[in-house]
Amino acid sequence: MKKLLILVAFVALSFGTFAQSVSESTITKRENRRGMVLKEWNTPAGDKRAFLDRKTTYDEFGRKIEEIEYASYGQKWRVVYEYPANSDITAKVVREIEYNDRDKVVRIRKYEYDEDGSKVRQLNYYPNGKLESVKTFEYVPK
């Protein structure tokens, strides 16, 4: 009986971990991006001065945690990505917070995944927490 309980607990924990897992290629990319800040520069045709177009910040696991898009006047928008507490390199984003050019929250997105780790729902909320819309993902085999 004790072995059965241990087996059930192991299987349950495995499904929780597996649901958040990402592909091997994603893990390799994340390993190469640990603690990185990626800056994208844009140079208009006929101009020699480049301007910062986008900045992406990665955490110690190589997961994207912030992305900022710039315009000539400064920040256009910013998105902060959140992962489950105490998660590791294999975790998928569970929440995004989008800010406008004045750094005010304009939208919050929450994500749900199935046991295979595929995204199944995206819940979009207004800044006040009221549900705006729900996007459902359907995977149709060939």
Q: What spans do the regions from the language model cover?
A:
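Sec-dependent N-terminal signal peptides
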Residues: L4-L13
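Sec/Tat signal peptide C-region and signal peptidase I cleavage site
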Residues: F15-A19
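Buried hydrophobic residues that stabilize the cores of well-folded domains
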Residues: Q20-K142
